[in-house]
Regions:
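WD40-repeat beta-propeller superdomains and closely related acidic/aromatic-rich repeat-like regions
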Residues: 1-449
């Protein structure tokens, strides 16, 4: 039988397909269970929930210092006309996409590729970074800047030291860790407002670059190439995505189709690139010549997408379906020959009474899948389902149990796995009740006593 956390309890971890719970949120139960096996405790990180953080206005700031009044007025008029035209075309091609954003599994929490450092969106304009390797500092670091408004997505840079990209209104903030005697350097030629320092003790974080999006668009999708050289970004307001050469600060726009973009995912090997749109289409690209193959869905638009670690298989969730889809590549890169196979999550319907899949995350080992879902019966509402995954020619899943968050009526806002945690899958969840909790999923024989 799948493990079910009783109402009022909180989940602590998995031990060999058994999801352990406690009566309240504290480190004591963690020390009694997984800490003996892992040698560390991942304490929950409290944060102020989004609803109580005031949002900044949407109007872009126009720099006019050093210009004459006539030139400044002309620039204002041109800018206003451009804004009117942009808004007109966006209302035609991307009418309600901003209202659909909450249905998409935006990356609101991200683990550093090689460190025990987690970052997550903690408010409309701020990000929290918690370094579990820093034993001297128990407090998280808060990243804020006047340039960082209306944060939607974040992603750690692979092979880039401690460097974090944050998608927000008007562009992408690039943060880097600074140390005494070794301060992070701002990109040559970048804007003068850069160099903002983070708040909090311990490691200081510096805003080293701001990559401006076309027409001040809201960045709502980010994905790094595995080597950390290129960063892909997109907006629900636009049908094109941009590939940034981050070292140069230069972006190249690429467009296919008309719909606004909901999601971008670079494959772990870098050979393929996935782009999904709100009109129900999605594109598979091979990155050798940047050739694409269009796909369309009859089950709504893609709300979740995750690659397997080999980059030869992908799981998709759709807005109008209780069934996942798995993409299997039939040949080696750069071939785009692939087929889509359904993956049934039978228990989601029979046990929870859910109305649809919300978000998904697949750990790098390929053995654990986390799924959140819409609605559900009272006792199942707001839980995360954890599945055991088996990969052969086709993907098969079996339900292990459910994770319940802390507080009253908790709901998962965002979640992600640590891709390189050696002792097993490590799932972090940001809950609507204002806690980011981390759950070790331990089942390997060489760890268990």
């Amino acid at each position: 039988m799948p493990s079910f956390p009783q109402p009022g309890s909180v989940t602590i971890c998995e031990i060999n397909r058994d999801l352990i719970t406690a009566d309240n949120l504290s480190d004591d139960r963690a020390k009694e269970t997984y800490a003996k096996l892992l040698g560390m405790v991942f304490s929950p990180v409290p944060f102020q929930s989004d609803e109580v953080v005031s949002r900044s206005p949407d109007e872009p700031e126009i720099e006019q210092q050093g210009r004459g009044n006539g030139e400044a007025e002309a620039l204002s008029l041109v800018s206003a006309l451009r804004g009117i035209l942009n808004n007109y075309f966006k209302s035609i091609f991307h009418p309600n996409h901003v209202n659909l954003l909450p249905e998409v599994g935006l990356q609101g929490v991200s683990w550093h590729q090689h460190k025990h450092i987690v970052a997550f969106i903690s408010g409309a304009n701020q990000v929290i970074v918690r370094d579990y390797e820093d034993s001297e500092c128990k407090d998280p670091c808060i990243l804020t800047s006047d340039s960082q408004r209306d944060v939607k997505v974040l992603d750690w840079r692979p092979n880039g030291g401690k460097s974090l990209s944050v998608g927000c209104k008007g562009g992408i903030c690039i943060w880097a860790a600074s140390y005494p005697g070794n301060a992070a350097s701002v990109r040559s030629g970048a804007a003068s407002f850069l160099g903002t320092l983070s708040r909090g003790s311990g490691t200081r974080w510096t805003l080293v670059d701001f990559l401006r999006s076309p027409d001040g668009e809201q960045i709502s999708a980010l994905s790094w190439s595995p080597d950390g050289r290129y960063l892909a970004s997109a907006s629900y307001e636009s049908s094109s995505f941009t590939i940034w050469d981050v070292a140069q600060g230069l972006g190249t726009p690429i467009r296919r189709g008309l719909g606004g973009i909901s999601m971008l995912k670079w494959s772990p090997t870098g050979d393929y690139f996935f782009a999904a749109k709100f009109d129900g289409t999605f594109y598979l690209w091979e990155t050798n010549t940047w050739t694409s193959e269009p796909w369309s869905s009859t089950s709504g638009f893609v709300t979740g997408a995750t690659w397997d670690t080999d980059g030869r298989m992908m799981l998709l969730a759709f807005s109008g379906s209780l069934t996942l889809g798995s993409i299997h590549f039939a040949s080696k890169p750069p071939s785009l020959d692939a087929h889509l196979v359904p993956v049934d999550l039978l228990e989601i319907v029979s046990l929870t009474g859910s109305q649809g899949i919300e978000k998904i995350a697949w750990d790098a080992s390929g053995e654990r899948l986390a799924v959140s879902y819409k609605g559900g019966d009272d006792i199942y509402n707001g839980l995360i389902a954890i599945y055991d995954v088996r990969r052969a020619q086709l993907i098969s899943v079996s339900l292990i149990g459910f994770i319940r968050g802390p507080g009253d009526n908790p709901k998962p806002v965002a979640f992600a796995f640590h891709d390189k945690f050696k002792q097993g899958p490590l799932l972090s969840v940001c809950w609507s009740t204002g806690f980011c909790c981390t759950y070790p999923l331990i089942f390997r024989s060489h760890i268990l006593p």
